[in-house]
């Protein structure tokens, strides 16, 4: 069984095709940029991820076929806690708010009294890295986007 592993990173996406014993058959990488805005805001254009994914898939399938191999499964790993609001057609409504973005500091500070409860539920404290505060920020600061959001 050959598995194509897709890793969606902060500055690039990689696709590595492994054969059943773990040997690397092919490796592809596509680079993209984050946008660093005022006040420690960090965003990325979701279209960059989509374009990188299609490029890696196309190249990986072609190389596998050239080697007489096939792709039996795909596994995806991704940077955590980045948030993209999408509409009912799964189209992005804004850039992704990245995991290292700090725009939600004020939300997290206002919730410090909940740290013990949050920790008991999920093993983590209220922190701007995590996605919940980013969703709250969109609800509070970009209500026009939040109103159109089907999922994050």
Go through each PLM region and give its residues.
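N-terminal glycine/serine-rich phosphate-binding loop of ATP-dependent small-molecule kinases
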Residues: 1-94, 120
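Glycine-rich phosphate-binding/catalytic subdomain of phosphoryl-transfer
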Residues: 58-152
């Amino acid at each position: 069984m050959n598995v194509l592993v897709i890793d969606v990173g902060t500055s690039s996406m990689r696709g590595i095709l492994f054969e059943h014993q773990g040997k690397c058959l092919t490796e592809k990488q596509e680079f993209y940029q984050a946008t660093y805005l005022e006040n420690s805001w960090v965003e990325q254009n979701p279209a960059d991820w989509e374009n990188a994914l299609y490029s890696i898939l196309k190249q990986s399938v072609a190389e596998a076929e050239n080697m007489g191999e096939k792709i039996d499964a795909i596994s995806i790993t991704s940077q955590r806690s980045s948030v993209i609001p999408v509409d009912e057609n799964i189209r992005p409504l804004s850039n992704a708010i990245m995991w290292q973005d700090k725009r939600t500091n004020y939300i997290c500070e206002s919730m410090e009294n909940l740290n013990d409860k949050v920790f008991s539920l999920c093993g983590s404290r209220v922190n701007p890295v995590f996605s919940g505060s980013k969703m709250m920020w969109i609800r509070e600061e970009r209500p026009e986007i939040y109103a159109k959001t089907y999922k994050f």
